[in-house]
Structures are given as C-alpha cells and as structure tokens.
Curated annotation (Swiss-Prot):
Lineage: Bacteria, Bacillati, Bacillota, Clostridia, Eubacteriales
UniProt protein name: Large ribosomal subunit protein bL9
Keyword flag Ribosomal protein: yes
Any Gene Ontology CC annotation: ribonucleoprotein complex
GO MF terms held by the record: rRNA binding; structural constituent of ribosome
Homology family: Belongs to the bacterial ribosomal protein bL9 family.
SUPFAM superfamilies given in the database record: L9 N-domain-like, Ribosomal protein L9 C-domain
Biological-process GO terms, alphabetical: translation
Physiological role: Binds to the 23S rRNA.
Keywords: Ribonucleoprotein, Ribosomal protein, RNA-binding, rRNA-binding
Protein origin, superkingdom: Bacteria
Length: 147
C-alpha cells in the first residue's frame, strides 16, 4: 500500500515522503497512529502542491539573502572606542556589537549568531563574515578607531 508519511518514521522515511508499506503495517500501525495517510490521488496532489510551495519559498528566501549580501558587500563599520595602554581596548568588540552597529549605521537587522568574527581587543581594521543563509555569506570591514 502506498502511503504519505505525516511524520518521520525510522524504518520508512521522512515526513512528506511517498513510500510503499505493507498493507497490515499501514492499516494497523501507521494510519491509526497518524504517522501516515493513504496515498490517494487527491492526497498526492496536495503533497505535490505543498512541496512546490516549499521549493518556491526557499528560492525566494535565497534570492532575498543574496540581495542582502550584495548590499552588505564592501560596507565598513566604524567603532570609536576608548583606548588604554598599548592600544588595547577597555573591554572588547563582539559579534553582538557588530550587529548593533549594522542596525545603527545601515538600518540592517542581522542576528548576532550569523556574524562570525574574532573578539576584537585592539585598534585596527578587521574582517567579519556574515552568514546570511546556509549558502550565502559576505564579509564586512570592521574599523576600530581611538576616540
């Protein structure tokens, strides 16, 4: 019997897969426990529509991420901070600070978890990588200047 999985089933497949299961297993276990539904023509059509909608949504998100990466490319974030001895900062500049500065300077709201940068403790020019989407990332310059 062909069934559409509603949840991940260890021995059969992942949610949304169209699989062949024995009649007894499907009727007595999968369908009553709402792990699967019978693969009727209508259900298969609905499944295909859902998969197509998900594919379009992912494509749209990828395009938006690429636009954001393009707009961030070549941007420079400037920090003016108080300096102690030997050009060292009081404290440090982290990905959270970079995220806040991006919001302040360019009005771009980027989560701090998406910013990969070493902890900055001295003046100079550094590079921070921003991973916008799994396949899309860009780099921005971080300038730390004396106040």
């Amino acid at each position: 019997m062909k069934v559409i999985l509603l949840k991940d089933v260890k021995s059969l497949g992942k949610k949304g897969d169209l699989v062949n299961a024995s009649d007894g297993y499907a009727r007595n276990y999968l369908i009553p426990k709402k792990l699967a539904e019978q693969a009727t023509e209508n259900n298969v059509h609905i499944l295909n529509n859902k998969k197509e909608a998900e594919r379009r949504q992912k494509l749209k998100e990828l395009e938006e991420a690429q636009k954001l990466a393009k707009s961030l490319m070549g941007k420079e974030i400037k920090f003016k901070v108080k300096i102690g001895e030997n050009g060292r900062l009081f404290g440090s500049i982290t990905s959270k600070d970079i995220s806040e500065k991006l919001k302040e300077q360019y009005n771009m709201d980027i989560d701090k978890k998406k910013i990969v940068a070493e902890t900055i403790r001295q003046t100079g020019v550094y590079e921070a990588e921003i991973k916008i989407y799994p396949e899309v990332s860009t780099k921005v310059k971080v300038s730390v200047l004396e106040e």
